[in-house]
């Protein structure tokens, strides 16, 4: 299966090597954190190489995801659990929309979340992950990928903390056993284009809710990023890199020093509407009690405080209601 990574010559999204930060060379560590912070300030996006998942694991991941979404509709609906607000298991077609959008996105998805292995009291706050009885390999690969992307995300947050002149460990306690989500997305085929709403798209323009998002390359084109001057640019394909972008929680915390960038997934040309697109983002969330009050160091005379004080849990609840997953 051809997996699409990222290369966007029309916009400056830098490519960074994570080994530069997790190695012992302090000069490379500093350069990595500075380049990461600058990218998140300029565009909100960066490409990361050597993130811990090789091509064979990514291929296996997409193989299992395709297998799940190929199950009969009735079988998939058995894993859609009322009351979980899409945070675990299956969410069917037409259930989620972008903030302020009227028409649901043309997608279905599966989500798995945190498994707390220690005695952290937060373990009582999270629902158990749903296991697919027909596909044990699907369960296994999602757990493996979740663990790897969570570790990669923690390293990136340490680099961000350094860029912000915070302790490298600033985010550690907040994301240990955090409310992070791995989402397997299927943008399903449209066999009758005339049957969908004129404004229906695979994923309407939006910003992510969380701290940072780590996106494994998709199976087809379609992802577009909105630049600061209001121009949409496609994210094209290359290699095994992942795309990492700033979410709204990090933007709030840094008072817009690090920017959450608007993005979307557009429909393919009409002749390709009958094809699927698969994608796997990892939404790195903190624990719900993390204080998102703007950092004092990010409040300046020319950048006054932009946001009301709020916890991560309060903000997540607000956004889940806005996108239609929670009533």
Regions found by a protein language model. Name each.
Residues 2-327:
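Peripheral, non-catalytic segments flanking oxidoreductase cores
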